[in-house]
């Protein structure tokens, strides 16, 4: 599978018609974008605001941050399962706007978790997003729309806006292109023998924080509560197959789109290791299911990917520690070394 990520640097963002990118400046026709968002009858009105670094602005009730991206080619391939047709993500060309993001706010959420982004002062200096220009989207639900339905509408509004902005750069020169290509059928005999094969175990969900007992959709627009350990191509993660849930408690979508561990394993591929592939898994509340998950994850790492070692990450704290430790232990019993654990916290 081969993914070509075409990055375009955005130096300024302002309202203007038509929506376009000219000389690294992004112009957005807010009236047109509002019409795109309000096609969803679950949203009554929406407020769009540009927040630039240094402005005395604090964005509150933040539930996700999304990088503007779109597939280059036929429309309908973006964020499959959410916007696009259900297909495997991770191949072809994807356009990406750098230095700008879509920020989703949901002031109507009754959940305990949301975030804020400061555009000035100490908060901006400490934030990953203090130096990024943002399009803040603040929707209002239509009468009679339930809380969970509105959450899905908010997510869709953000994804639509991300694609809308990225498509505006269709005629703009690309600043740099990154190619992510990995043949998962390659085995040790096909690669330099001196290099260890390293897999990645990505725990992407835990049920302990399910709101109202209902899991959020995060994989191809679907929830993963009962998901058994599954092989995915790392390009799927980078290309919109995985999104954040309906709060910022998980990794935000922007971070997943630029997953630092996946990109680092790619960077080191065929230099000091062979990137063997990715196994995704979930945490469980049931002890027997935990053992089952760990056993199956270790089998995929060992037998399907023929990995010599595995890097593991978890989601949230508390219970997921146990699940991750069991996966690491099962990998060790299979003769595969858990190289490290990286804790991606909210």
Task: Please name every model-derived segment.
Residues 319-331:
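Short Gly/Thr/Asp-enriched flexible loops that form oxyanion-binding sites at enzyme active sites
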Residues 185-186, 191-284:
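Small-residue-enriched flexible segments
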Residues 333-338:
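A short helix->loop->beta-strand "cap" motif at the edges of active sites that frequently abuts
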Residues 1-224:
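Long, compositionally biased, glycine/small-hydrophobic-enriched stretches that function as flexible linkers
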Residues 284-300:
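A general structural motif
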Residues 204-206, 313-322, 344-346:
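Gly/Ser/Thr-rich loops at beta-strand to alpha-helix junctions
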Residues 308-309:
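Structural motif
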């Amino acid at each position: 599978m081969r993914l070509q990520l075409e990055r375009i640097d955005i130096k300024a963002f302002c309202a203007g018609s038509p929506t376009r990118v000219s000389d690294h400046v992004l112009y957005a026709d807010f009236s047109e974008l509002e019409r795109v968002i309000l096609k969803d009858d679950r949203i009554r009105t929406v407020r769009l605001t540009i927040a630039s670094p240094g402005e005395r602005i604090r964005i509150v009730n933040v539930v996700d941050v999304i990088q503007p991206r779109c597939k280059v080619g036929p429309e309908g391939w973006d964020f499959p399962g959410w916007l696009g047709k259900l297909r495997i993500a991770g191949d072809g060309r994807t356009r990406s706007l750098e230095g700008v993001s879509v920020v989703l706010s949901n002031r109507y959420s009754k959940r305990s978790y949301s975030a804020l982004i400061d555009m000035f002062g100490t908060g901006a200096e400490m934030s990953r997003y203090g130096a990024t220009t943002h399009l803040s989207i603040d929707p209002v639900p239509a009468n009679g729309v339930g809380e969970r339905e509105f959450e899905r509408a908010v997510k869709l509004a953000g994804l639509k806006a991300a694609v809308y902005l990225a498509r505006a750069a269709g005629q703009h020169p690309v600043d740099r292109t990154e190619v992510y290509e990995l043949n998962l059928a390659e085995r040790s005999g096909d690669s330099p023998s001196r290099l260890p094969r390293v897999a990645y175990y990505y725990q992407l969900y835990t049920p302990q924080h399910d709101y109202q007992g209902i899991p959020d959709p995060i994989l191809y627009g679907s929830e993963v509560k009962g998901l058994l350990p599954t092989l995915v191509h790392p390009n799927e993660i980078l290309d919109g197959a995985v999104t954040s849930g309906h709060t910022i408690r998980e990794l935000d979508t922007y971070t997943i789109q630029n997953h630092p561990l996946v990109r680092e394993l790619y960077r080191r591929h065929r230099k000091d290791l062979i990137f063997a592939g990715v196994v995704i898994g979930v945490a469980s509340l049931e002890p027997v299911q935990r053992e089952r998950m760990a056993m199956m994850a270790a089998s995929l790492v060992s037998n399907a990917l023929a990995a010599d070692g595995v890097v593991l990450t978890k989601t949230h704290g508390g219970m997921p520690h146990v699940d991750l430790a069991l996966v690491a232990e099962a990998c060790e019993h299979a003769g595969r070394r858990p190289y490290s654990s990286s804790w991606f916290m909210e």
